[in-house]
Structure formats: structure tokens, C-alpha cells
Amino acid sequence: LAIEPVAEHRMFFFVRQGHPLVAAREHSLETILVFPLVSPRLPQRMAVHLGKDAAHARVDRETGDLTPSLMVDSFAVARNAVMAGDAVGLAPLVALEQDVRTREISLLPFTAPWLQLSYGLFYTRKRPLSRVAQLFMTQLRQVEVVLQAREQRALARLDGKKRTRRSAKRKARTAAEPAARVAKSTTAPARRARTRQ
């Protein structure tokens, strides 16, 4: 067989707005996977990390693949399951982009180098590809170029939002510090005056 890698996409855990994990302070795998996982069957390279923490999921002994709590092959079905309850979904950012913008779903701040969707094409080396198959491969790669660019823009927006939130928190802390100093300095003379009386 000849195998041609096509693309890689970062995967994100996502939940509905108002989900208990949105307000959680910790987002470890252990914390996230307390909730049912909704996704397609996951390959062994992900299963070795998710298998021990994913409640009600099981690892296939022969393939090493992970069958999640709720296995679905359609993103629309996975999204609906996540929106209807407390399940956690797993998908690439390009699939979630619109829902993130409208704030219907929330991405959980968990990243790992192994949390990637990788796919490719395979065919028999001995048999030459038909012109239709070659055309399909060319068009698929062109679509992927567009998707990769969209994904990079969406990631940049996410990083920008995180930075804005961090700087806003810093500014709020910095603004609160002088007020706290002034309050301390005004209470100190008052205490001294009381002790003199």
C-alpha cells in the first residue's frame, strides 16, 4: 500500500455554554473525562492517553482504538448530544468555529501534542491511480489549504482573546493595588491618632 498524508488538525474538547466545566478551575484529562465523551472511534495514539480516564469508554484489545461513551460518526449528531446535556465533544476547530463565535459552545483549555486529527489517502502501489482519483486528490489538497488557513486565523483569534483577558485581569489588579495602598495609608494615621488619645 502507498499512504499519502493529507493534513493534521488540532482537536479541542468542547461543551455547551453553562456546562459545569466552563466555570471549573482545573481542566485536566481526569476532570474533563468525568463527563461522557461524544466522538467517533479514536485511534490508539489517542486511546493510550484517554483510555484510563474516560468513563464508560473501552479500548479494543485487537486494534487499541477507543470506543467512547457515545460513539457517533456525524459531527452534527455529536454537537446535538453536547448541546442537549453534559457530554463533552471532541472536534477540530474548523468544525467548531461558528459555534465558538456565537458563544453557543465553549472550548476547554486543554492542549496536548497527541490531540491531533491526522488523515491521509492510501491506495495499491501496483495499480496506477485513475484520472478521477488523481483529480480527487488534487481537489482535496486544495480544500485542505483553505481549511488550514481558516484554522490558523481562528487559532490567532483565540490566542488574541486569551491575551486580552489576561491583560484585562492584570489591569484590574494593578488598578486595585494603589487603592489598597491609599486605604492602608489613611487607616494608619487614624490608628496612630486613636493610640495617642
Where do the PLM segments sit?
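Short beta-strand-centered segments that line the small-molecule binding cleft or hinge
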Residues: 1-11, 15, 83, 106-108
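Short secondary-structure boundary/capping segments
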Residues: 2-5, 28-30, 60-62, 97, ...
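Alpha-helical segments flanking ligand/cofactor-binding loops in enzyme cores
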Residues: 4, 30, 79-80, 134
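Hydrophobic hinge/microswitch elements
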Residues: 43-108
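A bilobed periplasmic-binding-protein/Venus flytrap-type ligand-binding module shared by bacterial periplasmic
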Residues: 14-20, 118-129
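Polybasic, lysine-enriched low-complexity intrinsically disordered terminal tails
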Residues: 152-197
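Secondary-structure junction motif
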Residues: 21, 27-29, 35-62, 129-133, ...
